[in-house]
From Swiss-Prot:
Biased composition, class Low complexity, residue ranges: 36-50, 660-673
Pfam families for this protein: Slx4 (PF09494)
Biased composition (Polar residues): 1-14, 165-175, 436-449, 542-558, 611-623
GO MF annotations, alphabetized: 5'-flap endonuclease activity
Subunit structure: Forms a heterodimer with slx1.
Name of the protein described by the UniProt record: Structure-specific endonuclease subunit slx4
Keywords for the protein's UniProt record, in alphabetical order: DNA damage, DNA recombination, DNA repair, Nucleus, Phosphoprotein
Gene Ontology terms: biological process: DNA recombination; DNA repair; DNA replication
Bias (Basic residues): 317-328
Amino acid sequence: MSAASNPIVLSSSPEHCAPRAAAPTTHDFNEAAAVPSRGSSPESILSPSSLCRLPTRSRYFQKESLSDEPRTENGPPRGPPSKTSERREKREKKVERSISEPAAGLDGVRPPLLPQKANAPKRASGSNKKRGKCSKSETSTNKTLTGRVAKSGSMGSQESDKTATDASQCGSLRQKSPKPSDDGGNNDLQLEAALKRRLDWTPTKDTSIELVDASQEGAKEGSSKGFGDLLAGYSFNNNLLFSKCTSNDTTAEESTEDSQNGDRASEAKRRTKQRTKKFTTLTARVTARYQSDDMHSRLQTENPDGFMESANGNMPKLKRKGTSRSKRQQPEVVILSPEEAVKSLNEQDLIFGTCSQLEREDSPTMIRDLQAAIHESEQNMASQPTNSLLQRAGGGSMSTSTVSRFRAPKSLWSVAARDLDGSLIDAEVVDLTESPSFKPSMANKQVTAGSIPENPPYEEKIRESDSISQPSKRIHNQDEAPKPEASEHTHLSMPNYNDFTDAVLSERVTEFGFKPLKNRRKMVELLEKCWETKYGPSLYINDTSDQQAGPASSTSRVASARLQVPEGQPSKTKESREATKPKTAAGSKRTTKSDANPCTAAGPTRERTKITASGTRLNKPSSITSYRDVEEIEDSEEEIIPSPNRLQNNFRISRSSKRTASLSVTDTSSSPSRMPLSAGLSGVDKRNPSDISDQITRAVRAQSSTRPGTRNCPTWHEKILMYDPIIIEDFTTWLNTEGLGLVREDREVNVGSVRQWCESRGICCCYRRLNRN
């Protein structure tokens, strides 16, 4: 071959890189877009927008094999491929298998090498100068190629081989130095680091909504919270949480749901109102008025559809209703005065009984009916003459049927009104002036107060009976007295009251129904007028036996005369009634005068054992003074101060024994011989006078049995029990005028002895306070 066919090509610019060198790391995107791509040009860097595109050419076109080296026509084949080229092939295969995103890598998206044109070295521009900048290692390798002689026929193949070798060398250099250059071209992309991260893991999508606001301090804390914490922060704050531009379908659905919820709430209210709780125990009945209905308030305040109502704007109304209910559940506490509290306690009705009795009937009228029945039974007990003297005074047939008259169906009320013997408990004071009586044939029948016929012949006989223990044989002995004897005693002589002591005079005054007077002369005049009104005018007799025995004997004689009157002669009964009318008319003025100040009365106002006391009260009903004497349950220990009921029973027994003794003396004394003054008195005066302090104690206890105290005017015994201060002057005056007369004591006491008696028994006493101006 000649030398002309093999020309030598010398590089005109040995210090710069060859035009077929690899592309530099920095590249201007605008200039690269204008320059057409050629096989001899370096590989261009893709723009950020092109990285997101799907690879089309590299995946569907055949790539050039770098291992197949072309052979020259005259020269031998080139050696095996370098290590950098093998590494390049492995990397390309790995990238093709693991690509999942469009920007998976740049080396796998290489376009195929195109054949270089012959006139490529002739083109030179400013952009080529920028791309010509390479590292020193590349320039040194390019310098070895300069000055090489090649044949003209193999020029194109040699140039293509150089281009492939240069590209592989640039790729290996790029792999060995992954750090970006200091010029700042690859700092924004960081392609190698992004490739490694996407091969290792796939990031999850963040569904939490972050509030992009730099002014809020809690933005970072809100992003770290979970979904439940975010929902917990939604609450109604009087602002519309949803926009008004909602669809018509959503509004219609919400309105239908609200109407359904309202219907359910109204049905629940009706159901709760219809339920009525039945009380079966005493505790439930008493505490029912203080229980609060919590179920009704819970159904109205709790609403499960709160969010839906807040969207429609209905929550403020429900909140206002809730506040009003909370106020109703807390009622105002009203503190009553002591008087109102006691009044409400007295008006409160409590029914005690077992559960079986209360469950028998649960009607609302049961309590009212029960109270009406109790009230009616109490009225019947008060109106019926329950004194057992009524049966014993009528004879043997009446005394044998003591309980038969009052026998009724057994119940708790009938059992409670009887004593240990089975008979009804006797009343304390019963005015039998106009009380009816019963025939012997009605003894075994049960009668009421309305069906009792009047039988006047037994009127005086009932008044003269003294006590239960008085034998009936005494009455039969009086019945045997002749009738002329009663006519002899029709004109009785008036006793000489001037010879009586003050105690006896005060006792006789109380027998006629008046209180004792302080003036002795006025008491004598009062007794004389009462005697004349009752028995008519008579002469004075100085016989003391007649003075003492006169009233008692006349009482017995009149009683015997009354008992002998048959039922078919009502004429004497009318006369006896007419005889008692003037006495009442004469004593009416004194009665009104004595009753003007009931609290200052020193003595009892009635005596059921005296005929004169009962004669002055003809028109008083018996139901006013009929009280049940219920015996208290005694304790095992002996009481230091006996109860009023014990004192009353003891005093009643002593009075009956005294009256029995006095009647026996007057009946047996038929001679007009002179007798001592104490013969007609009770047996207490015959004994030796006891200590005056014991007499004071007996007088105080006797007052409570004869005259029960009231709240405004209590007795002396009640005052002592309540530790009220006792005024010594008033107490001494009462003892001298009335108190000692109740126990048949003629002596008088002074202020010093009364004070000594009070101090010895621990009674609070004091003198009257003098008002000094």
